Amino acid sequence: DDVGGSATNLINHDEPEDIYEIVRKEAEKGMVLDNNPDFTLWGSGGCLSRALVKRPVMTTPYGATLYGMRDQIHEELKKQLDKGTVFPGIDSGTDLWPHCKYLAIHIYEAIGRVVVSSRKGMKWLQDVAKASNKLKRPIYWTLPTGFVVKQKYIRSVVKQIKTIINGRMASLFAGSSDAEKMHNFRQVNGIAPNFVHSLDACHLMKTVVSAKDNHGIESFSVVHDSFGTHACDIEQLGIVLRETFVDLYKEDILEKFMNEQGDLDLPNLPEYGNLNIEDVKDAEFFFS
């Protein structure tokens, strides 16, 4: 996806791109066109901040829903009001929920316009999970490193037990699970983030192995998809990161995933964008 890839610095730019700011501007543009008289402060009023947009954008790969985004925006808006941020027409007695719902709708739509292919890919993975649920099957996939991932969320049951302890009534909660009953909702909601995280882990492993075996780098500091090493090796690590990323994604990862799903009745693969994955090697701000 060349649009989403550009917004996330997968191609070279003179300055780093900021996907949160890109989505903010896109949402603001949509609200200006909408011109709803009850919410003009967010569009033409220019009050939509980057902070209000950040969490909805960050949690989109984790299956964030419209309602979830509304709640995130409500939490952030209250935080900003508590700090003393002034929003024209909003005071301590204002019902924030209509504003949050309106913002969530436009931010959700703006994200879809900025990361077009990512959202299509996420929906396709969720459709695969739904098809797997119909056959009551876990989902398996094999990473390029050979590691086999199994996703199987078990449905658990929590029972409340009332009893007397030291002469007083107490409530205890006991949980149990049935290994044969999958949690269908979690299977669907978890597939996209789990798939992405598995590829992040694969990229990490390939990077560390290549950096050590080919360049003698033995010290690493890693948190999720954040990579670090000593200052003397940081430039070389940046090169290795780009090389292993391209090596990982030049394969058709989704097609390989689809072929591992056996006899499931699957939807067609989503249409791919025009990003040239080799451009990552020249993307200055891919790793910084």
Task: Give residue spans per PLM region.
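Conserved catalytic core of nucleotide polymerization and phosphodiester-bond processing enzymes
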Residues: D1-S288
